[in-house]
């Protein structure tokens, strides 16, 4: 058998036959661009539909400007959202996990980009009068970016039915911020320094692999309330991650913050180890804050 006999005689294949709906992807991209335009100020340079967003950083008054960059996702909180059928908080989660990571450098968020990977876009479209999952995510991203003064300037939506199961999708985000070198916390922590903490409004978007395992082992469903609580555990877990940009930057403008940590993976103790020098320890007064 020669090689030519193995070539199929059928006509050319299309993207749609391969499981990728280019028209649906273009429609979603256009709708997201229209939403994202609400977050654009004069620093965003119009480029139409061209790839490669342009941004004019506000450098006035900065002696030694530095850019800070972060990349993060929302982890397996996606699985809780899917189980509960509630995706409304995930967009804010995605933005918050990134812009909050800029704060330990004292950086103000400038712009944000998203990456959305899906099995099939059709599985995530609006149904029965309810917005689709990705529409909820997009609305949340735009609202969160607007709240912190961060422009949503681009992103990517990839439809990969061979990689993701029907109804599955994943989220990642990228944020860039700006800070004057003189305002970056120097890390010169010393004995006697005061530790300040900002209260969380929930578990944010970390630790969900452990949380899901604990609930599964205990036989607790997401629709059940925990003892002494009225809200279902699912609703509590899906509380959107708090945006700390305004209070943290306001504090940093008034006092010199020596070090800061975003208490995500590893929690308070794990993150504190990264900013406290060897030979020192952090002492926390548990009576000073309410434990959940």
Residue ranges, per PLM feature:
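A generic structural signal for residues located within well-ordered alpha-helices
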Residues: 20, 24, 90, 206, ...
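Predominant activation on well-ordered alpha-helical scaffold segments within soluble catalytic domains
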Residues: 26-33, 51-55, 65, 96, ...
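Short, acidic (Asp/Glu-rich) active-site segment that either coordinates a divalent metal cofactor
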Residues: 71, 183-233, 269
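Glycine-rich phosphate/pyrophosphate-binding loop regions near the starts of catalytic domains
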Residues: 34-201
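Short loop/turn motifs at secondary-structure junctions
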Residues: 106-108, 210, 256
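Acidic/polar, glycine-rich intrinsically disordered N-terminal extensions of enzymes
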Residues: 15-40, 44
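Glycine-/charge-enriched secondary-structure boundary and capping motifs
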Residues: 2-17, 34, 63, 123-151, ...
């Amino acid at each position: 058998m020669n090689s030519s006999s193995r070539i199929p005689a059928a006509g050319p294949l299309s993207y749609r036959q391969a499981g990728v709906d280019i028209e649906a992807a273009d429609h979603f991209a256009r709708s997201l661009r229209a939403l994202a335009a609400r977050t654009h100020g004069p620093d965003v340079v119009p480029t139409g539909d061209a790839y490669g967003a342009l941004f004019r950083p506000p450098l006035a008054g900065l002696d030694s400007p530095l850019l800070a960059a972060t990349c993060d996702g929302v982890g397996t909180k996606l699985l809780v959202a899917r189980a509960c059928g509630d995706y409304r908080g995930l967009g804010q989660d995605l933005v918050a996990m990134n812009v909050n990571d800029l704060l330990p450098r004292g950086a103000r968020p400038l712009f944000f980009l998203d990456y959305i990977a899906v099995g099939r876009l059709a599985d995530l479209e609006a149904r029965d009068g309810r917005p689709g999952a990705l529409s909820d995510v997009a609305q949340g991203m735009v609202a969160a970016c607007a709240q912190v003064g961060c422009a949503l300037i681009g992103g990517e939506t990839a439809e990969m039915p061979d990689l993701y199961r029907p109804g599955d999708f994943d989220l990642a985000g990228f944020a860039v911020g700006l800070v004057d070198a003189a305002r970056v916390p120097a890390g010169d922590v010393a004995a006697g320094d005061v530790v300040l903490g900002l209260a969380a409004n929930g578990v944010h978007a970390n630790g969900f692999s452990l949380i899901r395992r604990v609930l599964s082992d205990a036989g607790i469903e997401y629709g059940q309330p925990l003892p002494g609580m009225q809200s279902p555990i699912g609703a509590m877990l899906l509380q959107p991650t708090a945006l700390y940009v305004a209070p943290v930057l306001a504090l940093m403008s008034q006092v010199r913050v020596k070090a800061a940590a975003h208490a995500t993976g590893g929690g308070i103790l794990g993150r504190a180890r990264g900013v406290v020098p060897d030979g020192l320890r952090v002492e926390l007064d548990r009576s000073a804050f309410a434990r959940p």
